Amino acid sequence: MPLTADQVAALKASWPEVSAGDGGGQLGLELFTKYFHENPQMMFIFGYSGRTDALKHNAKLQNHGKVIIDQIGKAVAEMDNAKQMAGTLHALGVRHKGFGDIRADFFPALGMCLLDAMEEKVPGLNRTLWAAAYREISDALVAGLES
């Protein structure tokens, strides 16, 4: 079910706090370190190896995390135009086809780690709302991945 105009407005209003500081770079890094800690088998698929705590100093992972959070920010900015947002994310999913064995079943766990990292950064975050937003974002991306 699509997000309502009020929900989109609430997401947009909370985004500056979510991405505050370094534009979300640290948030993206926390997302991936949580994800790899809970799903160590995924490190290889994403092109990483070693201990998950050592990854906090990996420049490539830091950049990847920032790129992910930037893309979420773009999706939030486009959420009041669902067709535009879906098109942008669909194209992103298509580009990810060339990055190896990325499958739709990776996204729920990644989303949980994202929500955990967001909630740690922003206590009182509306997790239910952000979970719904993540579903819309990941569904559009997966549609491109599977096209």
UniProtKB/Swiss-Prot annotation:
Keyword terms of this UniProt record: Heme, Iron, Metal-binding, Oxygen transport, Transport
Classification via CDD domains: Mb-like (cd01040)
Note: This protein is one of at least six components in the polymeric fraction of Glycera hemoglobin.
Protein name stated in the entry: Globin, polymeric component P2
Subunit: Polymer.
Domain Globin: 2-146
A Pfam family hit: Globin
Organism for this UniProt entry: Glycera dibranchiata (Bloodworm)
Gene3D superfamilies per the UniProt record, alphabetical: Globins
Amino acids binding heme b: H96
Gene Ontology molecular functions: heme binding; metal ion binding; oxygen binding; oxygen carrier activity
UniProt record similarity statement: Belongs to the globin family.
